[in-house]
Amino acid sequence: MTQRTKTRPVKVGNLTIGGNNELIIQSMTTTKTHDVEATVAEIKRLEEAGCQVVRVAVPDERAANAIADIKKQINIPLVADIHFDYRLALKAIEGGIDKVRINPGNIGRRHKVEAVVNAAKERGIPIRIGVNAGSLERHILEKYGYPTADGMVESALHHIKILEDLDFHDIIVSMKASDVNLAIEAYEKAARAFDYPLHLGITESGTLFAGTVKSAAGLGAILSKGIGNTLRISLSADPVEEVKVARELLKSFGLASNAATLISCPTCGRIEIDLISIANEVEEYISTLKVPIKVAVLGCAVNGPGEAREADIGIAGARGEGLLFRKGQVVRKVPEETMVEELKKEIDVIAAEMAAEREKEKQEQ
């Protein structure tokens, strides 16, 4: 596994970001925050999908006043996204928000920033500094001519210093850009410049398909260097899709111990079963499991089990039947019409065993 960059730990609600902790998956609601019922419903869907921290826009007082009601009805940390008006940050903090996303430089005069910092410090709430290539300060753009990684790091350090001068150190930083190469360079330089946890993202990445590819390319490159402590996949799509993509990305790098993985072959002329529909059905079935089970769905009974030795459980199709196997060893043959149900039963058994083992380990710690 890639060696992770060391950062200081920062508490966000009941989670700790940074330090030696796993990467945390975030998303953002698409509802009007003042519509508490709709916002809570969307957050619960995100929770079910595996979202661990959720951010809401707080553009006005109605949204800020809704924070307390939303907090009462959800189970994951809530982040307030604030721009310009420091009073909205104060109201969000008063309502029990778990983290505030601001840029200290656009909040206003020092006394306004100090008011937010003091309120956050009193409640033990961290602040995320959100640097974005598309909204860098004028003096930085004048200095560099256009958005650059060095300019983004300079902006981050400027905002960090504002908070540090007020003796505030519960800081998380993001360095977002829609240009993949720029984002990669900015995060690399940020990781060398300071040890605060980094929230990863490729902003304005696009629609479900294009945005998934773009985010995977950019964030994959960053993750491969051991950089990052939280991430959001930004898509013009249902935010649940953001969480699904994030989970798959982390699994690809061995960075998610709480998610199931599907192994399936690309199909060929030897296949005797409807492998594509079976693989999709099984993928949906395991999508909400919170254990690191590996499941294989393969179309060839000759090579299938051997090609998926690392799978905890799997099925390999043949004409009229399937081979059920564990760790590459055939367990039994099952009729084609029942093989998916038999596979699901085995998945349930193994997932329960893994969950019990994890609970036992927790109790022994």
UniProtKB/Swiss-Prot annotation:
Q: Which cofactor does it need?
A: [4Fe-4S] cluster
Q: Name one GO biological process term.
A: terpenoid biosynthetic process
Cited Pfam families: GcpE
Q: What chemistry does it catalyse, as a reaction equation?
A: (2E)-4-hydroxy-3-methylbut-2-enyl diphosphate + oxidized [flavodoxin] + H2O + 2 H(+) = 2-C-methyl-D-erythritol 2,4-cyclic diphosphate + reduced [flavodoxin]
Q: Which UniProt keywords apply?
A: 4Fe-4S, Iron, Iron-sulfur, Isoprene biosynthesis, Metal-binding, Oxidoreductase
Describe which pathway this protein belongs to, using the record's wording. Answer: Isoprenoid biosynthesis; isopentenyl diphosphate biosynthesis via DXP pathway; isopentenyl diphosphate from 1-deoxy-D-xylulose 5-phosphate: step 5/6
Q: For this protein, what does the record note about how its cofactor is bound? A: Binds 1 [4Fe-4S] cluster.
- Per its UniProt entry, what is the enzyme's top EC class, as one word? oxidoreductase
Asked if the Swiss-Prot or TrEMBL record annotates the protein with the keyword Ribosomal protein, the reply is: no
For the ligand ([4Fe-4S] cluster), the binding residues are C265, C268, C300, E307
Q: Which EC number(s) does the record attach to this protein?
A: 1.17.7.3
Task: List the GO molecular function terms.
Answer: 4 iron, 4 sulfur cluster binding; 4-hydroxy-3-methylbut-2-en-1-yl diphosphate synthase activity (ferredoxin); 4-hydroxy-3-methylbut-2-enyl-diphosphate synthase activity (flavodoxin); iron ion binding
The record, for Gene3D superfamilies, names: Dihydropteroate synthase-like, Sulfite Reductase Hemoprotein, domain 1
Asked if the record carries the keyword Metal-binding, the reply is: yes
InterPro entries in alphabetical order: Dihydropteroate_synth-like_sf, IspG_bac, IspG_bac-typ, NO2/SO3_Rdtase_4Fe4S_sf
The similarity comment for this entry is: Belongs to the IspG family.
UniProt function note: Converts 2C-methyl-D-erythritol 2,4-cyclodiphosphate (ME-2,4cPP) into 1-hydroxy-2-methyl-2-(E)-butenyl 4-diphosphate.
- What is the name of the protein in this document? 4-hydroxy-3-methylbut-2-en-1-yl diphosphate synthase (flavodoxin)
